[in-house]
Regions:
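Acidic helix N-cap motif at the loop->helix transition within catalytic regions
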Residues: 16-20, 41-49, 94
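Cell-envelope/extracellular polymer assembly enzymes that use nucleotide-activated donors
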Residues: 4-6
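Short beta-strand-to-loop acidic/aromatic patch adjacent to the donor-nucleotide binding site
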Residues: 79-90
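Short, well-formed alpha-helical segments that are part of the catalytic scaffolds
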Residues: 12-27
């Protein structure tokens, strides 16, 4: 049985990194959701511009709140496993 895996990408003010991060996750073949955690830069707009699957939190909830939003998304859409890769691109998704 193949598990359905979701990569949760919490992002706060990551407009310069988010496209590259999402691309690296996509290149590995994983589904993803970016959680824009109340960014004050244009992270959300960059996500929309690049047709990135994103949830926009109206205020900054911190890493815990952003990841929790991702867990809820995973449950809602029937994922078996979810993992976190930070929006700054410092986690290598090939290790998932």
């Amino acid at each position: 049985m193949n598990s359905k895996v979701l990569v949760i990408i919490p992002a706060y003010n990551e407009s310069t990194n988010i496209v590259k991060t999402v691309q690296s996750v996509s290149d590995c073949g994983y589904d993803y959701v970016v959680i824009n955690d109340g960014s004050t830069d244009n992270t959300f707009d960059v996500c929309l511009e690049h047709h990135i699957n994103v949830i926009d939190l109206p205020q900054n909830l911190g890493i815990g709140g952003a990841v929790q939003a991702g867990h809820k998304y995973a449950l809602k859409y029937g994922y078996d496993i979810d993992v976190q890769v930070d929006g700054d691109g410092k986690h290598d998704p090939t290790y998932i």
